[in-house]
Design a protein with these regions (language model features):
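Amphipathic alpha-helical packing elements
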Residues: 105-119
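N-terminal non-globular leader segments, chiefly Sec-dependent signal peptides
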Residues: 1-102, 120-135
Length: 135
């Protein structure tokens, strides 16, 4: 793959179209309270303009992730609304680590954080290499 193709893949991760999904229907304060109730021992991050990205990766990578309780998917968001651990200021972007759980109610859990997916978002698929290049 040449550089132009790789840059195109990275652009698609950030700005490409995907299948529309609805996020958490709750207001921000209610969503924050629900995250604390459902995941009391994890920091939470409320986000908007998000994508749930299923990663295209080698079978060995999929097997390894499954063996440690993870799935080949991440969240990318263009807008952090609130981060309970104060890692990201409001308005910044964020990319999660691998998925532990996800439900259609708008809660995506990674190993260390719960992401509350506010408003509409998209589901897309992208190569692992392109997603990991965004940091």
């Amino acid at each position: 793959m040449d550089v132009e193709q790789f840059v195109g893949q990275c652009w698609d991760v950030l700005h490409g179209e995907g299948t529309p999904l609805e996020g958490c229907p709750l207001e921000e304060s209610d969503a924050q309270a629900e995250a604390q109730r459902r995941f009391p021992n994890k920091p939470h991050c409320l986000i908007r303009q998000w994508s749930r990205i299923t990663l295209e990766c080698e079978p060995e990578t999929l097997a390894y992730l499954a063996s440690v309780g993870l799935r080949a998917a991440v969240i990318f968001a263009h807008q952090v609304v609130f981060d309970s651990a104060n890692r990201c200021p409001p308005g910044s972007w964020i990319r999660s680590t691998y998925e532990v759980s996800w439900d259609m109610a708008g809660f995506f859990e990674s190993k260390h954080t719960v992401y509350v997916l506010l408003g509409p978002g998209v589901q897309k698929t992208a190569p692992l290499r392109a997603v990991l290049a965004i940091h």
